[in-house]
Amino acid sequence: KPKANTPYYSATIRIKKAKKLEAKGKIEKSKKIYNEALKYLYVANKEKPFDPDILNYLGFANRKTDNVKDAEMYYLMGLEIDPTHNGINEYLGELYVITNRIGLAKERLNVLKDCACDEYQELKDVIDGVKKSKY
């Protein structure tokens, strides 16, 4: 759990808020909040570089603001540090699905196959077309 009153904490609060707005179909409003989160995440990344959780959220918030190239870069940086990070593997897999790189998405799924985690099923459902990416 992130420490209160840190840039990372401030970013996570905004990401949760943006996800709620997105779930209600308020996409443009959610993108503004994701952009606010990014400002905090860039500061957090400067203060604590090489933190896979920060890199995961940098990838996530960039993807949510349609900046797929930067999102992929941050996800890949995070995987260099922690190749089995569940969140990064799921979200990068979803990015690969939305950019029509199913083979790469399946590679991420393969990494998650033994994790006994929600991320495996979430990504599998997105790859199989059972559901659209929740995030």
Task: Pin down the residues of each PLM region.
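Structural marker of alpha-solenoid helical repeat scaffolds
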Residues: 47, 81, 112-115
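Residue-level recognition of tetratricopeptide repeat
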Residues: 51, 85, 117-120
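Terminal, low-structured helical/coil segments at or just beyond the last alpha-helical repeat
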Residues: 4, 106-135
